[in-house]
């Protein structure tokens, strides 16, 4: 996951699925972004669905409206946006930046393990 991809069609589906899986907040979910630094790739360009609310909004209106507001209007593409909004009820997020070094990755997954124990 990269912040530059935030709000693309895959995210719309992913966030809607997570909302469904929590049963409206009855179940807890831990979201591990495996967030890496932005780069020059254009993988996050698939946001045209946000310009077609008649086709896409009906599947999960709160998620669609949230992403349209943040991506199209505010031009704000950061996973932190969804974390602070509370759109995925009863969710905990592991959003530390994941780097390539072996020691850093071991630390990353150790921290993730601690979060699962909570």
Predicted features by range, described:
Residues 1-118:
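Class I S-adenosyl-L-methionine-dependent methyltransferase catalytic core
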């Amino acid at each position: 996951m990269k912040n530059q991809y935030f709000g693309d069609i895959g995210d719309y589906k992913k966030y809607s699925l997570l909302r469904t899986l929590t049963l409206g907040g009855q179940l807890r979910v831990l979201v591990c972004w495996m967030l890496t630094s932005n780069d020059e790739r254009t993988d996050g360009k698939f946001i045209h669905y946000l310009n077609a609310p008649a086709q896409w909004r009906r599947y999960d209106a709160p998620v669609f409206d949230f992403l349209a507001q943040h991506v199209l209007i505010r031009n704000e593409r950061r996973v932190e946006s969804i974390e602070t909004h509370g759109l995925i009820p009863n969710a905990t997020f592991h959003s530390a930046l994941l780097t390539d070094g072996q020691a850093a990755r071991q630390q990353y997954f150790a921290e993730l393990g601690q979060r699962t124990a909570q």
